[in-house]
Amino acid sequence: MIKHKLRKFGPVTERRDYSQTNRTWETFDFLETQKKSFKWFIDEGINQALNDIYPIHSNNGKVIIEYVNNSAKLEYKTDNEYKILAEARQKGTTYSGILKAKLTKTIVETGEIETAEVLYGDVPIMTSGGTFLINGSEKIIVSQLIRSPGAYFGLKVRNKQADDLFNKLEIIPKLGSWIEISHRVTGNTTDTVKVKIDKHKAVSLVTFLRAMGMKKETIQNLFGSHSTLEGENPILKETLNKEKFKTEDDALEYLYSVIWRGNNRITAESKSNLLSNILFNPRRYNLSKTGRYMLNRKLSLVDRIIGTYLAEDLFSAKGTKNAKLVFAKGTLITREIAEKIQDSFKNNIFNLIPIPDVSSDIYAAQLETNPKLAERIRVISLNIYPNKTWMEQNTNPIIVIANDPNSTELHLLASDLVAIVSYYFNLVDRVGQDDDPDSLINKRIVGVGELLENQFKIGLSKLEKNAKERMSAKEIEKITPKNITNSKPVYNQFKTFFNSSKLSQFMDQVNPLAEISNKRRVTSLGPGGLNRETAQFEVRDVHSTHYGRICPIETPEGPNIGLILNFATYAKVNDFGFIQSPYFKVNDGIIDYEKPIFLTAAEEIDKKFAQSTVSVDKDGKITTQNITVRQNHDYLIVSPSEVDYIDISSKQMTSIAAAAIPFLENNDANRALMGSNMQRQAIPLLEAEAPLVATGIEADIAKFSVSNLIVKEEGEVSYVDGTKIKVKSKNDKSKTYYLKNFEHSNQGTLLSQKPIVKLGDKVEIGDLLTDASSFKDGEMALGKNVMIAFSTWNGYNYEDAIVISERLVKDDVFTSVHIEDQTIQFRTSKAGSDKLTREIPNVSNFSKRNLDEEGIVKVGSEVVAGDILVGRVSPKGEENPSPEEKLLAAIFQKKPSTDKDTSLKVKHGHAGTVLDVQVLSRASGDVLEDSVEKIVKVSIAQKRKIKVGDKMAGRHGNKGVISIVAPVEDMPHLEDGTVIDIILNPQGVPSRMNIGQVLELHLGMAAKTLSTKFVSPGFDGLKFGTIQEILKEAKLPENGKFTLIDPMTGEKFDNKVSVGIMYMLKLSHMVDDKMHARSIGPYSLITQQPLGGKSQNGGQRFGEMETWALEAHGASNILQEILTYKSDNIEGRKGLYNSLATGNKIPAPGTPESFNVLSYELRGLSIKLESQAHFKNAQIVKEVMDNE
């Protein structure tokens, strides 16, 4: 027997583990990213947003409203969350808290101060499951993956012409103007460098720098010594030569006219404040903390000077008696030396250089209030040679200018701009690196907390405008913080965001995996993101920096492919929004298992990473001598001592859904993608069953799924039943956990919980108390283990169709329960009020058979389409009675009924058992919309057995539709009489290259024979030879093939067939939801054609192609009837009916309505369309008149 470990998964399940990974790190809370982000919003984001908007000054400057820092508090209930959420779901309300903050009013003249607490309205609160309950429905906010604020350099193609290349630099803030610096690098002539602010006209770089206050000589000195081998920088020289402005003031005036074109009122003050307001004003320009971090990292020396040679001696404390040589001229700069040089400048060991001519003009407006600004404009300057050849030829050195590494300001500084321009010219001399826009080094996650903060700021800015208007309209003495603060803008902003934003989604709750995946989804779309119509292939493609951060497999198949992604299993997001991946540190070939180290993509540069499957001894020493490691974009073979880090798990690369696919490494990536997506569509079955062949992540999903109840305080189980579990803690306090029973998800699937603990069990924090839908014994269980054969069967499994045994129907193997709500409102209007009643006019007793005395359906009733669920009559209004109604009223001496039947009926194509009825009424104290007096909600449960037309799939992207349910006696069987449950087409395997399903088949058969279970993680699963050995152990054929017998003939199949156990899923694409038929139904008002789709009770129209078919057969009369009488010629049809009834001649058909639509459209274009018959008649009249 091959050596293996027995590992425990969940409370009771043991599985054989043959994986090579020596030790893995336990998975953490899968919802940590969402929860952490929302906690930041409550703790810091709200306070930060209020500080950004306040103080608010009145228009006359006499009153200031200020926010008292850290006084904001969000009040909401956290105790007994289960009951609060259950009530909110029932009543269709939002789970929210009230936001309060303290504001002070200061009268400038007197200095009088008044403080008051004001309300900012309701803010939706995140539940413990990472969701928001909005109007009774669970929603989630999807995290956004967008380009980080910062500076980006690189070659760009303009006008989609490969020969039209531009060197381009973009400075992207979180708030404020975008700056673009560029010049053409193709063509025979030297192009000048241009600067573009937002979408304004481009100006010369020299003009821009001179407008900042730099003289031509300063520009030449700072950037002109960027030499090429020819000895001079031709691009800067050309730009300087073409500079047309004589003075800095002229340059500033021109820049002002470009930015404020059309504004002729140029004053000295407005000119001097121009750049200050656009780039250096914290209220108008904000890089954000992330942007400042990115800018400092980009403009630092480290990544720019690696591999170059020092062109000067570096001394510590230069210019003093204690000066000491640290690095000599000619030193090759490695990463280690580059980091030491950068740190030395940062810690003031090497001196920073002040920039002349800049600060006085740029900061003229701010110097009075903050004189220290001028002192901060310092930069790092270093002379280097790009390579050894340049150094040996003793050419002019290149000056590399970096910004002040101690900068923390969130707006741009002059030192930043100087360093950026330096970097730009350095790139011409091949010093520095172009940025990869698709790398995760340059992309960050905008979490739910930051998205809510942005919405809060938008709401506050509207509130600020409103407050200023109110202050202008009131006397100073009557202004108070309360009466000028209107909470509606903030409340409405949150409401709009949660109800209509692309990032706010109705939670996918088909099964627990779908729920967790939906919460861990990342999108590149949405505000500030990409557009699916214009996103290129490069943006959608897998990138090397995705490893351990973004799953390369799980993504949609349609137009969103590569734009909607999922976090990898162990990925985290740091405070700056960059995704981190965990690794164990390797020191001289020995793995440090103490604690994983989380690294961003930028921190991985130049490091070597080994895979988790390398051989390791009991002391953590790597025993494999030649190891394949990952470094940057390449794979190398190195010795153990050269390895820097090692993966913590083989699941590290993939998302949770992809990690749930066994033998993932044996499947083609396209099929693995389908397998990941289809697992999220698996319907919870009546009786869950865990897979015989799992990956190990199933137990982790159970542990962190909000569907299951988890122990919060250790103790002993003191009470268990189907509705609640009580746990008695050590201090004799009892905590009650309430179970869900027959609740339904957003998608109508069953949510139910079963206890898995017994009376007297000792439980600890984190232990599972229940199995929810799609869980079994503390493991995720989406499908069933069934006997599969790969064979053809009378052509019924052609083109991926599936043949199933009737046993699966009779034994309810794939039976599921679906619950749907139908709601009706009772309103009050001018015409009268809707009434709840059993006395409904013109309705048979059969349709009312299930109603109680009030007119509401009884719980437990079996209902079918058309049955009345809630009886409602509504006033007709001021309608005139028809002659028939008048006659009946005269005969029976009754007044004609003023009510019409508007009852709630079971939808077309639906049926089931009434599970629950809820009544909400204003009289009972429920909060309802205006004019709504009562709401009745009826829940109908439907038990669906598997049938022809339902879609099934395995976990390897092997999907198909059931084509026949064959009787058990007709299904092939093994020699021992075991009947096959499902027959799949063997031709579906080779071309799809998802061999994992075949390996699962054989291992599943062995698992059943040995009465054991296996775990086979992706990229660390069982190898083919190991499976053969296990089949031997189970005394099964090594090739996994068996003799099948055809029961119809009693003969054996000619060839042996692969037979085994595979885990199959029933997907949420059921024929009951799709099949539809109608006899009569609604028609489009304009074209008089039938509506389309099941949701609108639509039908089939005789369309263009059907018309061609009749034309081809020459069936002119049938064609004429179909296009006129039988279609949309309403008047013609009435005439036809009268003719047939009276026996008269059938009138000629009129013009079809759809033809009239065409003629009306042409009339709109001033074209009059007349038929040929009209012209003929006109011609005859003309001839008669001529003859006369």
From Swiss-Prot:
Domain of life: Bacteria
Top EC category: transferase
Catalytic activity: RNA(n) + a ribonucleoside 5'-triphosphate = RNA(n+1) + diphosphate
Keyword Ubl conjugation: no
PROSITE patterns from the UniProt entry: RNA_POL_BETA
MF terms (GO), sorted A to Z: DNA binding; DNA-directed RNA polymerase activity; ribonucleoside binding
UniProt-listed SUPFAM superfamilies: beta and beta-prime subunits of DNA dependent RNA-polymerase (SSF64484)
GO biological process, one term: DNA-templated transcription
Cross-referenced InterPro entries: DNA-dir_RNA_pol_bsu_ext_1_sf (IPR042107), DNA-dir_RNA_pol_bsu_external_1 (IPR019462), DNA-dir_RNA_pol_su2 (IPR015712), DNA-dir_RNAP_su2_dom (IPR007120), DNA-dir_RNAP_su2_hyb_sf (IPR037033), RNA_pol_bsu_bac (IPR010243), RNA_pol_bsu_CS (IPR007121), RNA_pol_bsu_protrusion (IPR007644)
Family to which the UniProt record says this protein belongs: Belongs to the RNA polymerase beta chain family.
Assembly mode: The RNAP catalytic core consists of 2 alpha, 1 beta, 1 beta' and 1 omega subunit. When a sigma factor is associated with the core the holoenzyme is formed, which can initiate transcription.
Protein name: DNA-directed RNA polymerase subunit beta
Organism annotation: Mycoplasma mobile (strain ATCC 43663 / 163K / NCTC 11711)
Gene: rpoB
